Amino acid sequence: LEAEGVIGGGDLARMKEEAEALVAEEARAVIEAPWPEPHRAGENVLAKEPRRIRIEPLEPSTRGQAAANLPPVETGPPFDAKGKTFLEAVTMGVADALSADPRVFVFGEDVGGKYGNAFLLLRPLLAQCADRIINSPLAEGAVLGVCVGAALAGQRPIGEMQFNDFVATGFNQLVNNAAKIRYRWGESVPMVVRMPWGGLRHAGPYHSQNTEAWFYRTPGLKIVVPSTPYDARALLASAVADPDPVLYYEHIALYRDPRVKQVLAAEAPAPIRIGKAALRRRGSALAIVSYGAYVHVAMRVAGKLAKDGIEAAVLDLRSLAPLDRDALLALALQCGRVLIVHEDTRTGSVGESLAAIIQEEAFEYLDAPVRIVGSLDTPVPYSPPLEEAFLPSEEEVEKAARLLLAY
């Protein structure tokens, strides 16, 4: 730098001396500062949340306290063959965000140019928003790192993983940077990561995984999993407005499913609070808890049971983190039998965590063991007959429900 005339003689030594003095001053301030009060260990993980504490479910004051918190039935707009697909709803949600806030931009692989992402989801937006739908290198760590930096700089990035499987190469940016920055030094990281996910499409082990459990146990990340077009659009609005990093899981098998279409208004919907489950069907004989594409499997099974005079409730979690524990426990207390259904493999899954919560906090109200139906503990097979054997079928879910009812 001296040879090029960028800095003068002695500048380097002076800058080094100034830097060392600054570090020494800050280090001295930290050393002299008092230790924080122990109760602060549970603070500042997410914005606007109560201090996190350990729950002791055996305390008399906490047992059965969620019994009165059963949410109302929330079906959303009826399914309509003339309505919008799940994919179109996500497109509308991105359009809502881009039009409402100039700080919003989309960043990901093949999202811009003339392509509009691997599913052409963003193509309708390119004509008006080409300068804010930006192609990234083929590097998921770079996508997520740019989003973290942009969020810290005051922007509202919507990052895209072309398939949620690919997030593995950007793991550090999510779990060690985005998730921990608020807890470490109090800064907000308002970013959304769109995560196309799931099987049911014969796409093999690198384009079909369920990665939500990877992040479910990471404090500092929020996770939403809409199951309907209406919720997809409304939850995306909530995610973009949120001050914390949000993983937005959109199930690929729902994208163009003709059975899952809803008429959506031209104007943006009211946001849905992240962390609020939806009771899709009321019942008292059995509670079926699910999220994502398998909510629709749960609804079909509940419909079959109803033909035999058995009324099963269906709870659509919508958010995994934060989790609507009150709705989950209230339904367990009301029904006494709980069937958890998801596409993910069983071991270490969200379902196992839900079962543990119910067993610990509602044990006295249960009439049967909590049952979990998930995929086999294998990678996702590519071959159609193998994938069909890997995934939990509607028939398996119905069988599990009837066995639970007969217990």
What kind of region is each of these model predictions?
Residues 1-37, 43, 49, 53-249, 253-254, ...:
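Thiamine diphosphate
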